[in-house]
A protein has these predicted regions:
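N-terminal glutamine amidotransferase
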Residues: 1-114
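Contiguous alpha-helical scaffold segments within structured protein domains
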Residues: 115-119
Length: 119
């Protein structure tokens, strides 16, 4: 089952998000990720597997302190568990996470492809 954590404040968003996702581990998941604002945009870090893998990736990156971000744990319902399929999904300006199945994904994808978006 998926879990979502968001934070805006004075503390380290990275730490708050990881702590929050840790509290949701009992729900089960196959991948995890975070999107954290940075001066030059949004930094997204995702990983298949346990939260400890995501935590290790973040420690290696040593991102600058930020007070804003979102985190997600995913239980795959569409697409295999992978770094690519993990949430958050992002552009340079926005990151999103969601729980559940987007029933009309086919129609939405067709509209976006017609507008020039690629998948």
């Amino acid at each position: 089952m998926c879990g979502i954590v968001g934070y805006v404040g004075m503390r380290s968003a990275q730490q708050v998000l990881l702590d929050g996702l840790e509290k949701l581990e009992y729900r089960g998941y196959d991948s995890a990720g975070v999107a954290i604002t940075q001066r030059d945009g949004i930094r997204v870090v995702k990983s298949k597997g346990r939260l400890s893998t995501l935590r290790s990736k973040l420690e290696e990156l040593a991102l600058p302190q930020s007070g804003c971000g979102i985190g997600h744990t995913r239980w795959a319902t569409h697409g295999e568990p992978s770094d690519v399929n993990s949430h958050p999904h992002s552009t340079p300006r926005v990151s999103i996470v969601h729980n559940g199945i987007i029933e009309n994904y086919g129609a939405l994808k067709e509209r976006l492809v017609a507008k020039g978006y690629t998948f």
